[in-house]
Amino acid sequence: MVAIRVREQEETIASGRNQFALIMFTRPGCEFCESQQSILEFFINKYGWPVRTVDMDEYPNMAAKFDVTMTPTIIMVDKNSGKSMPISIGVISMSDLALKLYRSIRYMRGEITPQQWFMHDFEKGKSNDPLKYTEIQ
């Protein structure tokens, strides 16, 4: 079961690199931002995603556009539609980043509903699927 989850998560994230990008908002002197940058470099090397680092003080309008007030903050953006979703505020581990991206990609692609946020694809229609027991289907 764990192997299926990991494979599904990695395939989804890898497939998202052409559709999505990450923006990390930082500030000069932010030690947590430096820690997050190291984690993002590992993520970039593993998945090949585009990641842009934005200094909030230098680009306050961009921070305001995404309603960012703290650093580090990571936002996922759909390169085609421009829609975005917050991924983290503060430092997030590589495993938590991967899980959050997996869920966010599926949600933004319309593959899951908010009720199915905590599910993996192979669980759809089974006992863990909250929509299996509702009229929402």
Model-predicted regions and their roles:
Residues 1, 8-46:
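Local sequence-structure signature of Cys/Sec-based thiol-disulfide redox active-site neighborhoods
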Residues 1-17, 106-121:
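N-terminal leader/targeting and pre-domain segments
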Residues 5-6, 23-26, 44, 48-63, ...:
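Thiol-based oxidoreductase modules, predominantly thioredoxin-like and allied folds used
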Residues 10, 37-41, 60, 94, ...:
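Extracytoplasmic/secreted envelope proteins and their assembly/folding machinery
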Residues 28-35, 55, 66, 89:
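Extracytoplasmic/periplasmic, Sec-exported soluble proteins
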Residues 71-79:
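Acidic, Ser/Thr-rich peripheral helices and adjacent loops at domain boundaries
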